[in-house]
Amino acid sequence: MEDRRCDVLFPCSSSVDPRLTEFHGVDNSAQPTTSSEEKPRSKKKKKEREARYAFQTRSQVDILDDGYRWRKYGQKAVKNNPFPRSYYKCTEEGCRVKKQVQRQWGDEGVVVTTYQGVHTHAVDKPSDNFHHILTQMHIFPPFCLKE
């Protein structure tokens, strides 16, 4: 077998040990590219997150009737909280609203419901059915999530 020694291209650095710049069997026929010849990186658009709204409601049941229909798609344990968090999606076709439901850690009588997105359809049930829930809700400003 032929012993071919080729130099490995390193960024401009004079402090590289010459013994590290040689490898056996490496083809060095490709020409190095300069920074002006490199392909520009495509800038990916950052996905904008929809606003989130959190509500605290004093209730003995976790699933509150808010007038929409929901499908549960997950549940997970949360650190430092004995109560799991449940994940729901709106069942209306084309509606991308999600909600998370979890009991508050210090006060298990409080249910925290976080909504993400805005419904693209009318409410399924009249609002007078859950007037008592609305009177108990504490509305918080949208979360500012940083990536």
Curated annotation (Swiss-Prot):
Give the Pfam families listed for this entry: WRKY (PF03106)
- Disulfide pairs? none
DNA-binding region location: 59-124
User: An example Gene Ontology cellular component term from the record?
Assistant: nucleus
State which residue ranges cross the membrane: none
User: In the UniProt record, does the keyword Transcription occur?
Assistant: yes
One Gene Ontology term of the biological-process aspect is:
phosphate ion transport
The domain of life for this entry's organism is Eukaryota
Keywords assigned by UniProt?
A: DNA-binding, Metal-binding, Nucleus, Transcription, Transcription regulation, Zinc
Q: Where in the cell is it found?
A: Nucleus
Q: Where does Zn(2+) bind?
A: C90, C95, H119, H121
One MF annotation (Gene Ontology) recorded for this entry: metal ion binding
Disordered: region residues: 21-52
Q: What does this protein do?
A: Transcription factor. Interacts specifically with the W box (5'-(T)TGAC[CT]-3'), a frequently occurring elicitor-responsive cis-acting element.
PANTHER family assigned: WRKY TRANSCRIPTION FACTOR 45-RELATED, WRKY TRANSCRIPTION FACTOR PROTEIN 1-RELATED
Q: Which family does it belong to?
A: Belongs to the WRKY group I family.
Q: What is this protein called?
A: Probable WRKY transcription factor 45
